């Protein structure tokens, strides 16, 4: 008996919509990353992108526990001397609420071309509206 290997052209990808309101950031991000990879499917193959498309709405209402709202820091650097910028979770969720969830999920995906392809299937929106109604996404309870 041979081991089954999924082929990229035969993988069926579904669209799911997730409501992030009141959900904990890390728990939500780990489930989304797992579904983007396709680990919930029987045909999962590590070197093939078998995951589904995930639409996240209400990203501005995601929560963190404890004092992380003030203490959790996000950093970026311009590559120039003295170019380090740091933002707390509170500041970033006010400025760019989608970025918080995107960074959390991106860190949980593989690094390299396959991980970038998986990341492109994630669509995050700050509010309750999204523009993917034509794909008829199913509601996913996490």
From Swiss-Prot:
GO cellular component terms, semicolon-separated: cytosolic large ribosomal subunit; ribosome
Signal peptide region: none
Entry-linked PROSITE patterns: RIBOSOMAL_L13
One Gene Ontology term of the molecular function aspect: structural constituent of ribosome
Taxonomic superkingdom: Bacteria
InterPro entries: Ribosomal_uL13 (IPR005822), Ribosomal_uL13_bac-type (IPR005823), Ribosomal_uL13_CS (IPR023563), Ribosomal_uL13_sf (IPR036899)
Example GO biological process: translation
A Pfam family of this chain: Ribosomal_L13
UniProt keyword annotations, A-Z: Ribonucleoprotein, Ribosomal protein
Family: Belongs to the universal ribosomal protein uL13 family.
Protein task: This protein is one of the early assembly proteins of the 50S ribosomal subunit, although it is not seen to bind rRNA by itself. It is important during the early stages of 50S assembly.
HAMAP family, per database record: Ribosomal_uL13 (MF_01366)
Subunit structure, interactors included: Part of the 50S ribosomal subunit.
NCBIfam families recorded: rplM_bact
Protein name: Large ribosomal subunit protein uL13
Organism of derivation: Vibrio cholerae serotype O1 (strain ATCC 39315 / El Tor Inaba N16961)
